[in-house]
Amino acid sequence: MKFKLKGIIKLSKEVPGIEDDLEKFFTEAESDILRRGVPEGQEHEAAHIKSWRLEGDTLHIEMESGRRVRAHDGLLRLKKPLGQLLGPKYRVGVRGISVTDYTMEMKAPGVSGIPSLAELPFVEDAAITDGTIMVRFQPLEESDLRKHVFDRVVKHARTLVESSDDLTVQVTRATPGEIIARSRSRDFFFEGDPTEEAMRLGWVKKFPGRGQWFYGPKITALHRALEEFFIERIVKPLGFVECLFPKLIPLDIMNKMRYLEGLPEGMYYCSAPSRDPETFEEFKNELIINREVPMDLLKRGIKDPGYVIAPAQCEPFYQFLSHEVVSAEDLPVKFFDRSGWTYRWEAGGSKGLDRVHEFQRVELVWLAEPGETEEIRDRTVELSHDAADELELEWYTEVGDDPFYLEGRKVEERGIEFPDVPKYEMRLSLPGREKGVAVVSANVHGTHFIEGFSIREARNLNIWTGCTGIGLSRWIYGFLAQKGFETGNWPDFIGERVEGVENPRIITWPRQD
């Protein structure tokens, strides 16, 4: 690393004739003040004063350094001794210091771009040229330097560089994307777009919110049939017990999960209204008169976000166990939840029924000793394979390349145990498309949530957590993509649950082109 700084030392007044004393002070500082704590042989990494000049009551200084006594730390070190020199002799004090221009250079071989680096606080600009990152900082006041904001930016920059070697690759002993199991080929009975056909038939209707749909009686009957089928084939055989998980998750829980560091842009944030009747009275009056929602008034009546709507569905399980002590003899703890929607903001990523903002899942979560944690995860995958075969669907399972819980852990931290394979992802093949739709995400977290939520075993034995999400909304999409909408092409035990279910008769819907 290399740091180049242009700074200002502001004196309390202009004092002529102090240049000789300043020259002597800076020369001695090179071998004393700026060398303290620097290991022998690494003096070249310490801060050096490249030039200085006095203009009135302002001392302009340029410094360079390596990673030992960074240039801004060197500037801070100069302030007090300089005041002790000038005060008694010239009756002048040092009012403050600031940095007008600061750049950092860092070697990053193989890294071609880190867009988020330029978006960090206090960063003016960032670029990568010939394997070297150049970061230019905004002007910094003394208070910024003393709060170590610069050091935190540097640390985060290093983290971003190191994370370019994906942590998933670092911790996974298998190759992400490697297919580990595949079904036999199946006949497909549909060639169109399932979303378009479902709309044409009136099985779904687009809802005004982005990535949202109204699911009508037919597709809901299919949903319930598949849900009950998976519970009978996967959930009950493994001994999971049903619970009702909250879906409004406090930000503190998401912070413990490291979700806010990893994917803050992928969640819906929620705010509670303030207890201010006057604000809402004004809001109601303007709404009545203008017939438009006065967003400025609404914002005034809403508190800062305090929650997110559940983006992972498993969040309450870790909070339920937080600061609790369990005994290995009583493990595993196995819960499942199917009580409602999961929400993710996909921005421009939402398309049809296969990628929505609001979707249904059966979520399995468990706590066990490491070996059993992996065994449970593997059994959920095996039983999912069996279920897909019984449904006469074509599928494949691969090593996951994006375990959700690794998003916020950009560099591997000491003391956190990771499984050999953090995630398996099962996909249903889609006619005419190379990549199938993901329907099962089976994860082992190691001690990620054990550490984050302070969960402990009574004798300090190792315990891990795991979760498997059975994505009902995507199972339906994959099922319809392969089987089509004619129930005669479906397995009888599914088709009979949907036959006889009809949409209400509405003159204008579904629209017939």
From Swiss-Prot:
Subcellular location: Cytoplasm
Residue positions binding Zn(2+): 314, 363, 467
Keywords on record: Aminoacyl-tRNA synthetase, ATP-binding, Cytoplasm, Ligase, Metal-binding, Nucleotide-binding, Protein biosynthesis, Zinc
Keyword check for Cytoplasm: yes
Keyword presence, Zinc: yes
Pfam families: tRNA-synt_2b, tRNA_bind_4
Record EC number: 6.1.1.11
Catalytic activity: tRNA(Ser) + L-serine + ATP = L-seryl-tRNA(Ser) + AMP + diphosphate + H(+); tRNA(Sec) + L-serine + ATP = L-seryl-tRNA(Sec) + AMP + diphosphate + H(+)
Cofactor annotation remark: Binds 1 Zn(2+) ion per subunit. This ion is coordinated with 2 cysteines, 1 glutamate and a water molecule that dissociates from the zinc ion to allow the coordination of the amino group of the serine substrate, which is essential for catalysis.
Binding positions for L-serine per the UniProt entry: 312, 344, 361-363
Cofactors demanded by this protein: Zn(2+)
Functional description taken from the UniProt entry: Catalyzes the attachment of serine to tRNA(Ser). Is also able to aminoacylate tRNA(Sec) with serine, to form the misacylated tRNA L-seryl-tRNA(Sec), which will be further converted into selenocysteinyl-tRNA(Sec).
Family: Belongs to the class-II aminoacyl-tRNA synthetase family. Type-2 seryl-tRNA synthetase subfamily.
Domain notes: Consists of two distinct domains, a catalytic core and a N-terminal extension that is presumably involved in tRNA binding.
UniProt subunit comment: Homodimer.
HAMAP family membership: Ser_tRNA_synth_type2 (MF_01278)
Protein's name in the database: Type-2 serine--tRNA ligase
Source organism per UniProt: Methanothermobacter thermautotrophicus (strain ATCC 29096 / DSM 1053 / JCM 10044 / NBRC 100330 / Delta H) (Methanobacterium thermoautotrophicum)
Lineage of origin: Archaea, Methanobacteriati, Methanobacteriota, Methanomada group, Methanobacteria
Protein's gene: serS
